[in-house]
């Protein structure tokens, strides 16, 4: 057998043997401890003024078995939250050090006072074996701690709203993810990638070892498919692509007008943009399902939805803000046409800024 057919046959052989060998089936997990194809969360901001008394630990939850947001049964700092349940697989992988890999990245590393501008403005983690795994993309600085510390939610993550998306993926998707990470160059602060993955995955092991010498593309767009067949588009930009990812790329590629929620500090924001065929509008207030509306500057999440008059209903969740400085940073967004994801995020829009 030649090297190329052998390379193609190895993952299939591993999947066939996994049931016999007891390989764990890694996935996104809900609060009941059950595997789901995907879930989204929206952590609400801390509220101390009239109309809201939240501690900044409540979150909205939506997964592949649901049609709209529900209030979480547990606080986000609980190990019984959807994040806590899902990350339990990370801690098991760390303790076992067997054939399960993980990679954790954040431009704001836990237990550090410094924010890294040398890597992507991106936050997330991946856990996988040769059967499947999950990719969690989120907006929470300093999360999660290194695996040996177990599950903790940072106190700094309470003040503002945060968002994230977890997708369960077959191992066949990880070569594509490997190429996407090369583009946006995340700041990896904890990782373990056994040698068995180096047949197919080139860049993640190199980045894990801080030794990547591969040429970085300006940008890359690819299709990812969840374990149950839901298609996603992933946009990844490097520092060589210096335009606003929303206005210059995502809106024009999807051919939709976008309503964008991102962290926009005063005097550091990009205004709504109607100069291109497809427009981008900044969301200015969020309609809180469990509390009164709150302004966009209380929201650290990064997401967008197409306007209702667009021909397609898209939702994107990811890494970057609409600001001049962020146009120079690398990062990405993952987008879906799932109707329930769209409807749930669209209902959060209270009002947005027009170009006038």
Swiss-Prot record:
Q: Which UniProt keywords apply?
A: Endonuclease, Glycoprotein, Hydrolase, Lysosome, Nuclease, Signal
**Which of the seven top EC classes does this enzyme belong to?**
hydrolase
Please, which domain of life does this record's source organism belong to?
Eukaryota
Q: Which GO terms describe its biological process?
A: apoptotic DNA fragmentation
Which InterPro entries does this chain map to? DNase_II (IPR004947)
Recorded catalytic reaction(s): these are: Endonucleolytic cleavage to nucleoside 3'-phosphates and 3'-phosphooligonucleotide end-products
Q: Mainly localized where?
A: other
- Please provide one cellular component term from the Gene Ontology annotations of this protein: cytoplasm
Q: Which residues form the signal peptide?
A: 1-22
Q: Where in the cell is it found?
A: Lysosome
Question: Tissue expression, per UniProt?
Answer: Liver specific.
Where does the record say carbohydrate is attached? Answer: 77, 98, 114, 273
Q: Could you tell me one molecular function GO term of this UniProt entry?
A: DNA endonuclease activity
Enzyme Commission no: 3.1.22.1
User: What does the UniProt record say this protein does?
Assistant: Hydrolyzes DNA under acidic conditions. Does not require divalent cations for activity. Participates in the degradation of nuclear DNA during lens cell differentiation.
Share any extra remarks. Inhibited by aurintricarboxylic acid and Zn(2+).
Family statement drawn from the similarity comment of this UniProt entry: Belongs to the DNase II family.
Q: Which PANTHER family does its entry note?
A: DEOXYRIBONUCLEASE II (PTHR10858), DEOXYRIBONUCLEASE-2-BETA (PTHR10858:SF2)
Q: What is this protein called?
A: Deoxyribonuclease-2-beta
Q: Which organism is it from?
A: Rattus norvegicus (Rat)
| Underlying gene | Dnase2b
